[in-house]
């Protein structure tokens, strides 16, 4: 008879999320995940099927705990005209603070896109879906702030701002000042529109 798992699944997934976020999928070995989660290898495999299964759960947790709460002011109805500026300013502040996880580790999904695991079709689809979610949120914020823009101009501005945010997220762990400058560029693009 199989034993029932006796651990807090959410706490385990969050601990794994932190490990993957900090060191990446390839950098987090099973021994590292055992230390981070407090589970033994057999429990990881029995509960999640594989290291990859735990990673997939960690990605979903990252979206739910980190990404969607930050995007919520841009996705809730109605969107405040100040929401997009608030989002970008918050991102800029996070990059400027050397103690913040965003400044030290960047974005778990953007980091994953540039790693070997990013070539996996399911992982690539998750990263692409995140980028689409980010773009849609930024477009809603841009439209709320600049209702006079025609739809094509709003689309182009959303594309440009999304590119700047993705660049900032990719740069955060290696060059915080460049990450901050990329966010400043997005803010300047909105101010100029």
Residues covered by each model-derived region:
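Amphipathic alpha-helical packing segments from all-alpha helical-bundle domains
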Residues: 82-86, 104-107, 119-146, 156, ...
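Amphipathic C-terminal alpha-helical segment
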Residues: 94, 98, 114-119, 124, ...
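Solvent-exposed, amphipathic alpha-helical segments
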Residues: 15, 19-22, 69, 73, ...
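Helix-turn-helix
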Residues: 11, 19-58
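Hydrophobic alpha-helical connector segments
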Residues: 71-105, 157-158
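C-terminal peripheral helix-coil segments that are non-catalytic and often amphipathic
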Residues: 90-94, 132-144, 148-151, 155, ...
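Hydrophobic/aromatic residues within well-ordered alpha-helical segments
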Residues: 51, 58, 62-66, 91, ...
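Generic hydrophobic, amphipathic alpha-helix propensity
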Residues: 8-17, 33, 58-62, 66, ...
């Amino acid at each position: 008879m199989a034993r029932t798992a006796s651990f807090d699944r959410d706490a385990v997934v969050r601990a794994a999320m932190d490990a993957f976020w900090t060191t990446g999928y390839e950098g987090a070995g099973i021994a590292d995940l055992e230390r981070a989660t407090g589970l033994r290898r057999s429990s990881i495999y029995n509960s999640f099927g594989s290291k990859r299964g735990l990673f997939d759960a960690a990605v979903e947790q990252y979206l739910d705990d980190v990404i969607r709460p930050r995007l919520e002011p841009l996705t809730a109805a109605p969107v405040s005209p100040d929401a997009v500026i608030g989002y970008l300013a918050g991102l800029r502040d996070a990059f400027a603070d050397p103690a913040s996880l965003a400044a030290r580790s960047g974005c778990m999904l953007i980091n994953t896109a540039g790693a070997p695991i990013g070539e996996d079709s399911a992982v690539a689809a998750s990263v692409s879906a995140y980028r689409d979610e980010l773009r849609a949120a930024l477009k809603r914020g841009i439209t709320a702030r600049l209702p006079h823009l025609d739809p094509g101009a709003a689309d182009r501005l959303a594309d440009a701002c999304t590119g700047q945010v993705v660049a900032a997220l990719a740069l955060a762990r290696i060059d915080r000042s460049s990450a901050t400058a990329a966010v400043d560029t997005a803010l300047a693009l909105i101010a100029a529109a």
